């Protein structure tokens, strides 16, 4: 068997390796190393026509770049196959264009054909073994293709131009690449001193940065030696080794409790006082909430004045205190003083909130409308949780262990984002159900990781010819297995209930980034977004995103623009997640090798306190902490100086300073422990033994954080349950994914609802972003009322009751499934650019459909 996505080949080199059980299994059973037990191991999810569509998209000419005079360089043209590109429906704008036969020579130029057939243009297809003589298949198949070509906005489209003879030397393309990599005239400051002092300043600052880096590494080495031979000696060292040897979370908790008992951390839990949260407020609210809940439970089902008063008091308390980081109870320092758990007062408060929320969800003494309004407000205040997987080349395989730890304890969030290598892991998680993931996250999965299998004699020639080590088409075939073929973001959401987000950066330096998900790019093919997010300059050339039409055909997305690695600008897109999904609690698994070295928590982190001086000391002593923090902050300062003064050159046409100047952490940051050998094998595929170690280390790094995550998700899932069960219209989203619809929900029940929804037939199991994602409920209701008045449904001077409004809304929801919760999160269709067939359009909206709202 070849790599992921390939057909079976009768070749010994392409067969999986023999099953070998390593000497250390890290708690995995022998069958976990058997590659034949992997689900869909020999399934080829990617049809040949999708590979051909990707090759054609890569071979197509780039959009016309601007020139300083406002025109366009060259004579590139962009072809629009109008029937498929417009998805078979009319748009809100019209183009008065005529179709001309290709033989007439009008509407395209000879330079286009030359550029298209050149070695540079066909490099990707040639590397994949696909012959590309002549124009693309779609152009040869039709003589009425529509072309748009113009040198600028004022030149006529159909003007015939005679191609000039090319007299430029063969090295002109290389010179053009160098010009694109250099700063343009608009980006370069004027003055006499700038060109004179630029390189001397760059040399001085670079030497200073190198010196600071050496001091930082030496300081970290000193702290490592200090902790190993001083802090972790004796009994505490033995307990620490016992914790690291565990393979199950329950065993780790037992070892962590023994460590806390040995260090005397239990006394800290009993004492309510702590400077990093308001213990007095928490204590008063806890007592009042417990009293109100017990009074309400004692009243039972009797509708008494005392019972109604108790429920109202409990409702007010819940609305007031179920908020993000209420009174500081979600401060990470509350979980950084012990190996397991937090203050007893905080834990009791969370337990009481859970019991009170469950009572309010199940009580029948509150109307459905009262519950709907209450849980809608609580959901907006409390927010949602997301798992963010960073990039890091083959370091990204540590994410498997983090996901496995969350999955086995049912703490895996519904919102998952990935960048670069993390996007591949996120795509695997978002396209598989919990049961499928448990069968996949084993060491035998290494047999499907074959992206770096080529010898140096193959990839070096490709790098010399194309500037990229890996071939985009080859990676597309392999990536398709991880995404279950050409699934789109919407289809993955409908299948599993998880919201996948992938960060992509445009090839243009100054264009905004995009966070692909089922709202911003619902019809975008996942594997194309994963490839774009992993397209590091020099490793993989920028690629074109693809979208799937109603007929299953793949076409270029976003007008054929090319995209590259998301880690170059937004490794962890926290702001975009907060804007689109109201995420304010993030679990970040950070494995970037250039960041891992500089991460240092001088006063401990969640589940990993400072061991000496009862958690009140400094890691490595005060002197060691001073050296590390001084060098780290000074390095950041000088990197910002280089970027602000425009001293940095642009190797491979990219500003690399943002690789260090981003925010790489979250509310909870997981840092898997790596080895020095991982740096030497950063672009090599792991074998089952190495992958078993990476999964184990990923689990070990996630275990200390699970208690903090569990307390958060216990409350969040009850809020989502109340929101889901009390939506207006009798559960208008039941045909889709219940757990993650709009505002999200529980992890387990939503997947069953998704399967049931799809089994019900087409249309019932499909979730679509509705107009309520853009308009508020009041605005939408007013709009529909106004339209009904215009139709004569409501006479002059008549008033409409709430029941009539609900009936009116039902007419609207016949065509659009309710996407509850998205109206809270401030969502927008920033890059959808597509229309969903079969979605009814309200008559009062003037024919505007979803694809036009961008």
Swiss-Prot record:
The keyword Hydrolase applies. Keywords: Hydrolase, Lipid degradation, Lipid metabolism, Membrane, Transmembrane, Transmembrane helix. The active site is at 420 (nucleophile), 565 (proton acceptor). It comes from the Eukaryota. Residues 96-116 have a biased composition (Basic and acidic residues). One of its GO terms (biological process) is triglyceride metabolic process. Residues 387-578 form the PNPLA domain. Coiled coil: none annotated. Residues 119-132, 752-761 have a biased composition (Low complexity). One of its GO terms (molecular function) is triacylglycerol lipase activity. Residues 1-29, 58-138, 159-186, 724-776, 791-830 are annotated as: Disordered. It holds the Pfam family DUF3336. It is found in: Membrane. The keyword Membrane applies. Residues 729-751 have a biased composition (Gly residues). Probable lipid hydrolase. Belongs to the PLPL family. This is Patatin-like phospholipase domain-containing protein CHGG_02900. It comes from Chaetomium globosum (strain ATCC 6205 / CBS 148.51 / DSM 1962 / NBRC 6347 / NRRL 1970). The lineage of its organism: Eukaryota, Fungi, Dikarya, Ascomycota, Pezizomycotina.
């Amino acid at each position: 068997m070849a790599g992921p996505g390939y057909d079976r080949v009768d070749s010994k080199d392409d067969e999986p390796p023999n099953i070998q059980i390593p000497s250390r299994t890290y708690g995995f059973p022998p069958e976990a190393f058997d590659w034949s037990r992997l689900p869909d191991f020999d399934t080829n999810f990617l049809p040949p026509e999708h590979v051909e569509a990707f090759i054609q998209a890569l071979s197509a000419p780039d959009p016309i770049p601007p020139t300083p005079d406002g025109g366009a360089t060259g004579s590139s043209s962009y072809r629009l196959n109008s029937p498929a590109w417009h998805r078979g429906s009319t748009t809100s704008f019209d183009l008065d264009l005529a179709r001309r036969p290709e033989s007439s020579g009008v509407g395209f130029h000879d330079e286009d054909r030359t550029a298209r057939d050149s070695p540079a243009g066909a490099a990707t297809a040639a590397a994949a073994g696909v012959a590309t003589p002549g124009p693309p298949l779609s152009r040869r198949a039709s003589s009425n293709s529509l072309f748009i070509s113009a040198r600028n906005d004022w030149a006529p489209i159909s003007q015939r131009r005679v191609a000039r003879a090319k007299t430029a030397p063969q090295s002109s393309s290389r010179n053009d690449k160098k010009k694109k990599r250099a700063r343009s005239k608009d980006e370069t400051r004027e003055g006499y001193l700038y060109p004179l002092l630029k390189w001397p300043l760059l040399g001085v600052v670079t030497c200073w940065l190198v010196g600071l880096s050496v001091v930082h590494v030496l300081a970290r080495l000193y702290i490592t030696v200090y902790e190993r031979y001083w802090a972790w000696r004796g009994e505490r060292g033995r307990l620490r080794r016992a914790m690291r040897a565990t393979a199950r979370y329950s065993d780790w908790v037992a070892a962590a409790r023994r460590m806390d008992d040995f260090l005397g951390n239990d006394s800290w839990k009993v004492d309510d006082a702590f400077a990093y949260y308001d213990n007095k407020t928490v204590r008063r609210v806890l007592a009042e909430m417990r009293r109100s809940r017990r009074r309400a439970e004692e009243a039972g089902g009797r509708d008494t004045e005392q019972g109604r008063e108790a429920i109202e008091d409990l409702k007010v308390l819940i609305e007031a205190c179920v908020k993000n980081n209420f009174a500081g109870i979600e401060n990470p320092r509350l979980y950084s003083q012990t190996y397991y758990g937090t203050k007893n007062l905080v834990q009791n408060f969370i337990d009481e909130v859970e019991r009170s929320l469950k009572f309010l969800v199940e009580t029948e003494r509150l109307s459905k409308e009262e519950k709907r309004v209450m849980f809608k407000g609580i959901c907006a205040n409390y927010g949602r949780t997301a798992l963010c997987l960073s990039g890091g080349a083959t370091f990204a395989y540590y994410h498997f262990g983090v996901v496995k730890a969350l999955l086995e304890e049912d703490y895996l969030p519904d919102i998952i984002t990935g960048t670069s290598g993390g996007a591949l892991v996120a795509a695997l998680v978002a396209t598989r159900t919990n049961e499928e993931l448990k069968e996949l996250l084993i060491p035998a999965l290494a047999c499907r990781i074959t992206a770096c299998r080529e010898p140096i004699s193959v990839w070096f020639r490709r790098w010399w010819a194309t500037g990229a080590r890996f071939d985009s088409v080859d990676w597309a075939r392999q990536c398709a297995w991880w995404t279950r073929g050409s699934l789109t973001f919407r289809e993955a959401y409908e299948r599993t209930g998880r919201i996948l987000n992938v960060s992509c950066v445009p090839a243009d330096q100054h264009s905004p980034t995009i966070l692909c998900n089922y709202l911003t790019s619902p019809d975008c093919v996942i594997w194309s977004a994963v490839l774009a997010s992993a397209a590091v300059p020099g490793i993989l050339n920028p690629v074109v995103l693809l979208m799937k039409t109603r007929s299953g055909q793949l076409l270029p997305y976003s007008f054929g623009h090319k995209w590259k690695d998301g880690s170059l600008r937004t490794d962890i897109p926290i702001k975009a997640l907060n804007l689109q999904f109201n995420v304010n609690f993030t679990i970040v698994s950070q494995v970037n090798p250039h960041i891992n070295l500089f991460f240092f928590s001088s006063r401990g982190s969640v589940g990993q306190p400072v061991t000496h001086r009862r958690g009140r000391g400094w890691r490595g002593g005060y002197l060691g902490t001073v050296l590390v923090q001084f060098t780290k902050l000074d390095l950041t300062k000088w990197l910002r100086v280089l970027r602000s003064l425009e001293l940095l050159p642009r190797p491979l046409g990219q500003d690399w300073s943002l690789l260090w100047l981003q925010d790489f952490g979250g509310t909870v940051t997981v840092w898997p422990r790596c080895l020095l050998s991982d740096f030497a094998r950063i672009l090599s595929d792991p074998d089952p033994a190495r992958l078993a170690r990476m999964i184990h280390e990923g689990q070990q790094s996630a275990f200390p954080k699970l208690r903090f995550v569990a307390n958060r998700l216990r409350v969040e899932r009850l809020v989502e349950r109340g929101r889901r069960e009390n939506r207006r219209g009798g559960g208008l989203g039941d045909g889709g994914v219940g757990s993650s619809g709009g505002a999200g929900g529980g992890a387990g029940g939503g997947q069953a609802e998704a399967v049931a929804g799809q089994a019900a037939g087409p249309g019932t199991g499909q979730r679509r972003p509705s107009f309520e994602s853009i308009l508020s409920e009041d605005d939408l209701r007013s709009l529909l009322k106004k339209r009904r008045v215009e139709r004569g449904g409501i006479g002059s001077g008549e008033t409409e009751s709430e029941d009539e409004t609900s009936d009116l809304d039902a007419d609207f929801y016949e065509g659009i499934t309710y996407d509850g919760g998205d109206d809270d999160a401030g969502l927008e269709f920033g890059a959808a650019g597509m229309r969903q067939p079969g979605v009814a359009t309200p008559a009062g909206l003037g024919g505007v459909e979803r694809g036009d709202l961008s």
